[in-house]
């Protein structure tokens, strides 16, 4: 076993990677495939089934901003009534993400002090395996 691999495993044991998303989402399937192919251990939290608490959304907003978290291109966004999306700002975005967890971008990966939003194999390689 290489020293690099050993160090990576020590980091993974000490700092569990948490992956937030929706199990049946195509982007999540790509994420699971990538993580499994690179032997990355993680805990999956399905925020459609388990919900997401306001405190967690607040932490994410503080790290990356609501604009990066809110999925305004997905099907759920189109289903949200237009009057609920008027004058979109942080407070409204937060309320929408709590009411409609499927409107949160996927995946959200938390490891140590890192918060990764969306699937990007290159970012995963540098942030999760380095």
Language model regions located:
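Short, Lys/Arg-enriched N-terminal segments with co-localized hydrophobic residues
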Residues: 3-15
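A structure-centric signal for secondary-structure junctions around beta-strands
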Residues: 14-16, 104-105
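Local sequence-structure signature of Cys/Sec-based thiol-disulfide redox active-site neighborhoods
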Residues: 15-33, 43-47
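Short phosphate-binding/catalytic loops that engage adenosine nucleotides
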Residues: 40
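Thiol/selenol-based redox catalytic cores and closely related redox-interacting motifs
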Residues: 47-127
């Amino acid at each position: 076993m290489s020293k690099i691999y050993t160090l990576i495993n020590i980091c993974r044991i000490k700092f569990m990677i948490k992956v937030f998303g929706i199990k049946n989402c195509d982007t999540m399937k790509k994420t699971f495939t990538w993580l499994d192919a690179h032997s990355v251990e993680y805990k999956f939290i399905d925020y459609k089934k388990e919900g997401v608490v306001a405190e967690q959304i607040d932490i994410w907003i503080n790290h990356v901003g609501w604009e990066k978290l809110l999925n305004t291109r997905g099907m759920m966004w189109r289903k949200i009534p237009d009057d609920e999306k008027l004058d979109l700002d942080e407070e409204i975005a937060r309320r929408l993400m709590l009411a409609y967890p499927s409107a949160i971008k996927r995946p959200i990966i938390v490891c140590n002090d890192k918060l990764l939003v969306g699937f990007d194999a290159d970012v995963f390689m540098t942030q999760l395996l380095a």
